């Protein structure tokens, strides 16, 4: 949620930010209109309360003086004021809800360093690492390799759950588990993250804090009986962990890592990446979340990206880093880097991690603040998030980039201590 003061003081700046994102800026005028009405209602209510308090004092005085008729007249006026105040209080609540509902629909303001563009075609490549492998044979896609070994089963997954699910057996199931443990070990032992085990079901308030609600409810799985949402990413419980809290500056930054399955309806992705494991309703991910100060959050974002890159470098998978343009930014993000791994089946780089600074956007929704060391003043924290990395896509990248002419796949050296084997199948 962006600061209402920013909209009041600089509406043209906010409108321009929305235009850069490809959003309609008309909502800002609607917000300003409701905000003006809301503040005028508060002013009127306070004036009437003041008058009612004055009447109460005068009634007591008049009764002491024996002026009962005058006192009764004021009592009647006080009753009328009470009814007016009650009506204004109801109006104030309604206007505040309308205002809040509209504010929840406004995306974050892009940082000045974000390239301006309409869509992903205008994202800017920042760097590359490694070279795509040149095969001296025709490489197979992961959706051909896995089933050929009898270790990846899409048909039984469909029988169990429908489309966009996968069953894996034996060495592939162990490779998935090995990747999870490897990533957690790197981030906790080398990068200084605290591992957190989080709930996979969260309250509506929690997932509103992190920005998935109210705008993207159709993308989420909802357990209606208890009004709990399956998490689309561990970012949700991690970023909301300190909601309603005041942290001390000396505690920051906090660096959290969590492995969870992630659940997404992918309602808007019909027809995209329909084969294989690239776009699933359920997938594994290791997530990185920082809670930090405004002064250092963009510097911290660069470090978070490098932490995610380390995983791909250790796996020796070629990748590139791109800075998302304004038109491709996620709803909550002020700045995002995508890390894309090379997949031979697509002959292209595909996203395997998205790392974002959401500034104080989630902190305002969740009232997450810290006390400054210098003067004791309370300020909103900044939160960052990033995949460190998507496990299923890492498995896919290994299968496709490490395959051999005989149809087998060599396991990356760093994973062998975790798998206990060097070749699949």
From Swiss-Prot:
This is Serine--tRNA ligase. Catalyzes the attachment of serine to tRNA(Ser). Is also able to aminoacylate tRNA(Sec) with serine, to form the misacylated tRNA L-seryl-tRNA(Sec), which will be further converted into selenocysteinyl-tRNA(Sec). ATP binds at residues 264-266, 351-354. The gene is serS. InterPro entries: aa-tRNA-synt_IIb, aa-tRNA-synth_II, aa-tRNA-synth_II/BPL/LPL, Ser-tRNA-ligase_type_1, Ser-tRNA-synth_1_N, SerRS_1_N_sf, SerRS_core, tRNA-bd_arm. The keyword Coiled coil does not apply. One of its GO terms (biological process) is selenocysteine biosynthetic process. It is found in: Cytoplasm. L-serine binds at residues 233-235, 287, 387. It is an enzyme of class 6 (ligase). Homodimer. The tRNA molecule binds across the dimer. One of its GO terms (molecular function) is serine-tRNA ligase activity. It catalyses: tRNA(Ser) + L-serine + ATP = L-seryl-tRNA(Ser) + AMP + diphosphate + H(+); tRNA(Sec) + L-serine + ATP = L-seryl-tRNA(Sec) + AMP + diphosphate + H(+). Its EC number is 6.1.1.11. The keyword Cytoplasm applies. Its main location: cytoplasm. Consists of two distinct domains, a catalytic core and a N-terminal extension that is involved in tRNA binding. Belongs to the class-II aminoacyl-tRNA synthetase family. Type-1 seryl-tRNA synthetase subfamily. Pathway: Aminoacyl-tRNA biosynthesis; selenocysteinyl-tRNA(Sec) biosynthesis; L-seryl-tRNA(Sec) from L-serine and tRNA(Sec): step 1/1. One of its GO terms (cellular component) is cytoplasm. It comes from the Bacteria. PROSITE patterns: AA_TRNA_LIGASE_II (PS50862). Keywords: Aminoacyl-tRNA synthetase, ATP-binding, Cytoplasm, Ligase, Nucleotide-binding, Protein biosynthesis. Pfam families: Seryl_tRNA_N, tRNA-synt_2b. Gene3D superfamilies: Bira Bifunctional Protein, Domain 2, Serine-tRNA synthetase, tRNA binding domain.
